[in-house]
Amino acid sequence: MIALPRNRRPLFLAVFAYCAALLAFGLYLQHYQGIEPCPMCIMQRYAFALVGVIALVAGLHGPRGAGVRVYGGLLLLTALAGGSVAARQTWMQLYPPEIPECGPGLEYMLESFPLTSALPMIFRGAGDCSAIDWTFLGLSLANWSLLNFGAAALLALWLLFGRRVR
């Protein structure tokens, strides 16, 4: 097994930077490519943001010993939560329901609800969670999210159970 480095700050800060890049890419797709996020996408964004914040706090704190395990545990729980949402969305994309479960699209909300009711729904996201609007290398955004949450979970497990350099 690969040993954990003595100074874990760069590792935590790299996780933060990676999460920030993922969130920035999601915002790019939303604002410049016109891909509206569904509620599950928004939940995954929150999970990536939380993974990033935990990693940033850990990077600034520079924990040792049990502190590394605490941050690793928090990262693991957050990655598993986000990964479960991404896995559910991946399942929905593979086996789409006959009636979309994620709620109405943006146009329908703006036409059917007063603005005061539509704004909170818009913030939560719009669109059908089973729709595949973007792919890269044959994988949808939900698939890529699942892979990234899986990588974060593996890193967290390494932090929890990896051999320490003395």
UniProtKB/Swiss-Prot annotation:
Upper lineage ranks?
Answer: Bacteria, Pseudomonadati, Pseudomonadota, Betaproteobacteria, Rhodocyclales
Annotated S-S bridges: 38-41, 102-129
Q: Matching InterPro entries, A to Z?
A: DiS_bond_form_DsbB/BdbC (IPR003752), Disulphide_bond_form_DsbB (IPR022920), DsbB (IPR050183), DsbB-like_sf (IPR023380)
Q: What family is reported?
A: Belongs to the DsbB family.
- From what superkingdom does this record's organism come? Bacteria
PANTHER family listed in its UniProt record: DISULFIDE BOND FORMATION PROTEIN B
Cytoplasmic side of membrane: 1-11, 64-70, 163-166
Places the protein is found: Cell inner membrane
- Write the protein's name: Disulfide bond formation protein B
Sample GO molecular function, one term: protein-disulfide reductase activity
Q: Which UniProt keywords apply?
A: Cell inner membrane, Cell membrane, Chaperone, Disulfide bond, Electron transport, Membrane, Oxidoreductase, Redox-active center, Transmembrane, Transmembrane helix, Transport
Q: Which SUPFAM superfamilies match?
A: DsbB-like
Q: Name one GO cellular component term.
A: plasma membrane
One Pfam family recorded for the sequence: DsbB
Establish whether keyword Manganese is in the entry: no
What topology in the membrane does the UniProt record assign? Multi-pass membrane protein
* Functional description taken from the UniProt entry: Required for disulfide bond formation in some periplasmic proteins. Acts by oxidizing the DsbA protein.
According to the record, the segments passing through the membrane are: 12-28, 47-63, 71-87, 144-162
